[in-house]
A protein has these predicted regions:
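Active-site C-terminal subdomain of aminotransferase-like
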Residues: 22-23, 199-286
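Active-site-proximal loop->helix
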Residues: 100-113, 118
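Conserved PLP-binding catalytic core of the aspartate aminotransferase-like
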Residues: 294-313
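A glycine-/small-polar-enriched, mobile loop at the entrance of the PLP active site in fold-type I
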Residues: 12-68, 72
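Conserved active-site segment immediately N-terminal to the catalytic lysine
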Residues: 187-199
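Conserved beta-loop-alpha segment that forms the PLP phosphate-binding cup at the N-terminus of a helix
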Residues: 61-90, 94, 98-102
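Active-site phosphate-binding strand-loop segment of PLP-dependent enzymes
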Residues: 123-180, 193
Length: 313
């Protein structure tokens, strides 16, 4: 049996995945900060700083909770804290991850209205509008902003608030593979809940997944806590309000790394970072075209952060 090659601290190869992605050395070094007491003033300084910087990146005046979990954990937290048995939920589905989210909603007892589209395309805004027109009692609209499995990206997030506001529905965005690489205006676009994973466009190690909740959704969650311990967000709100703590032991080394990743994003500037991703994305698509390779997603639905290709014939 061949020995397993140990990874070194310095990056020696390019990880061309949706995530985990390459992690800057600054972020890696932050992870070896000595262990601290998670009920200490040192932790308060670390966690509060990371929370506030997360809210800046999401462009939200809501509250960020930094879950020690994968991105799927943050997505599931949104479901168990908002959705009750019999609630009607609209969700576009066009790939693996939107399908998983629809399944989570069904397991929560929701009446799920799936707007299915061919893989490589997105449900159109007109289809979403029609679903709202036909379902006045809808509780929430969920969407996977960036469908990693097919390389598609929804381009009408800024329009959905006109529909959710009309129906007084919650607006939830799964941004696991895109936040930090594309523009997100959470408050401006009327998004109630959004989440991501640290190992994607944030370029941090996997294991921390922020979920940001606005005041309206927070009020609902506090008044209707789920029957779960770890993903009960009202507990996180309470601990943060009272002491800037988390209710359970967090992944401390990962939090140090995560905060350093936030520092790098804000030093570069969110707008500059997004511009860089868009320029690199266009250059990459152009280069692939010159090689005779074709993207799986239709041009108008293509992601700017994840590229999926058709198999070569």
């Amino acid at each position: 049996m061949k020995p397993i090659k140990k990874a070194k601290l310095l990056m020696e190869y390019l990880v061309m995945l949706p995530g985990p992605t390459n992690v800057p050395e600054r972020v890696m070094r932050a992870m070896i900060t000595p262990m601290i007491n998670h009920r200490s003033d040192d932790f308060v300084e670390l966690y509060q700083d990371a929370v506030e910087k997360t809210e800046q990146v999401f462009k939200s005046n809501g509250e960020a909770v930094l879950l020690s979990a994968s991105g799927t954990g943050a997505v599931e937290a949104s479901v168990v804290n908002l959705i009750k048995k019999g609630d009607k939920v609209i969700i576009p589905t066009n790939g693996e991850f939107s399908g998983r989210l629809a399944q989570m909603l069904e397991w929560a007892g929701a009446n799920v209205i799936k707007l299915e589209s061919t893989p490589g395309t997105n449900a159109t805004f007109d289809q979403v509008k029609e679903a709202f027109d036909n379902n006045k009692d809808v509780k929430a609209f969920y969407c996977v902003w960036n469908e990693t499995s097919t390389g598609t990206m929804i381009n009408y997030l800024d329009k959905v608030k006109n529909l959710t506001a009309r129906n007084d529905a919650f607006y939830v965005v799964d941004g696991v593979s895109i936040v930090g690489g594309e523009d997100l205006e959470m408050d401006k676009w009327g998004i109630d809940v959004a989440m991501t994973g640290a190992q994607k466009a944030f370029a941090a190690p996997p294991g921390i997944s922020p979920i940001v909740v606005n005041n309206r959704a927070k009020k609902y969650m506090n008044e209707n806590p789920p029957k779960t311990m770890y993903f009960n967000l009202s507990r996180y709100f309470k601990y943060y309000e009272e002491a800037k703590h988390t209710p359970f032991t967090p992944a401390l080394p990962l939090l140090y790394a995560y905060r350093e990743a936030m520092n790098i994003i804000l030093e570069e500037g969110i707008d500059n970072r997004i511009r860089r991703h868009r320029i690199c994305s266009q250059a990459f698509y152009s280069g692939l075209s010159e090689l005779g390779l074709t993207p799986f997603a239709k041009e108008e639905d293509r992601s700017t952060v994840v590229v999926a290709l058709n198999y070569c014939k």
